[in-house]
């Protein structure tokens, strides 16, 4: 059974749409505790900490009976958008979102998603989760943006969608029409590389 260690609705929808059985439990890991300047490595470290935090607290979580003695996979993900060497998380306000989109208009950036899969077995009687394998990888996709007029950017920012997304855009939402093309994994831009997950769930 798979546990998604994230509160992300886009990751939840990706898993539901491709019919992967899972339950969703937020890890509540404090991301501000990690200091890593390399964006690629930061995404990977945050994904690991989210999954690991949940694995360490699994005994305090009420899990369905089918988890007992069975294989358990905990998936942690973290997405960071890189534009010209700078990390773009969620914009803090509309003004910041507008300024970013002015820069990104007609340009490209990279969406890095760190993936960590902690695989093991959980014994609900002893409350012990025994880890057998940890698989980690950062998957990167190149995202090309359309050349936009100021009124288009303002119109998009006014929807508030950019304020809730890494990089200030949602491929699966309103922002999809402002993205010209993607090089690399498509679902990775929405926060989870489904081909990577399929390959590694199959291995486990």
Curated annotation (Swiss-Prot):
It catalyses: a ribonucleoside 5'-triphosphate + H2O = a ribonucleoside 5'-phosphate + diphosphate + H(+); a 2'-deoxyribonucleoside 5'-triphosphate + H2O = a 2'-deoxyribonucleoside 5'-phosphate + diphosphate + H(+). Its cofactor is a divalent metal cation. GO terms for molecular function: nucleoside triphosphate diphosphatase activity. Pfam families: Maf. The active site is at residue 78. Gene3D superfamilies: 3.90.950.10. Its EC number is 3.6.1.9. InterPro entries: ITPase-like_fam, Maf-like. PANTHER family: BIFUNCTIONAL DTTP/UTP PYROPHOSPHATASE/METHYLTRANSFERASE PROTEIN-RELATED (PTHR43213), BIFUNCTIONAL DTTP_UTP PYROPHOSPHATASE_METHYLTRANSFERASE PROTEIN-RELATED (PTHR43213:SF5). This is Nucleoside triphosphate pyrophosphatase. It comes from Prochlorococcus marinus (strain MIT 9215).
């Amino acid at each position: 059974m798979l546990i998604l260690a994230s509160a992300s609705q886009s990751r939840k929808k990706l898993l539901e749409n491709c019919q992967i059985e899972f339950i969703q439990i937020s890890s509540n890991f404090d991301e501000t505790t990690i200091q890593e300047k390399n964006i690629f490595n930061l995404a990977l470290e945050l994904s690991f900490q989210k999954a690991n935090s949940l694995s360490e607290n699994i005994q305090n979580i009420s899990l369905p009976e089918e988890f007992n003695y069975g294989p358990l996979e905990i998936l942690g993900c973290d997405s960071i958008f890189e534009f010209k060497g700078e990390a773009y998380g969620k914009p803090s306000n509309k003004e910041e979102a507008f300024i970013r989109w002015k820069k990104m208009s007609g340009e490209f950036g990279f969406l890095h998603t760190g993936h960590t899969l902690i695989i093991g077995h959980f014994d609900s009687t002893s409350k012990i989760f025994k880890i057998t394998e940890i698989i980690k990888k950062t998957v990167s996709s190149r995202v090309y943006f359309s050349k936009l007029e100021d009124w288009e950017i303002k119109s998009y920012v006014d929807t508030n969608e950019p304020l809730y997304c890494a990089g200030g855009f949602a491929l699966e939402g309103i922002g999809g029409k402002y993205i010209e093309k993607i090089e690399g994994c498509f679902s990775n831009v929405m926060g989870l590389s489904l081909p990577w997950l399929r390959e590694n769930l199959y291995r486990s």
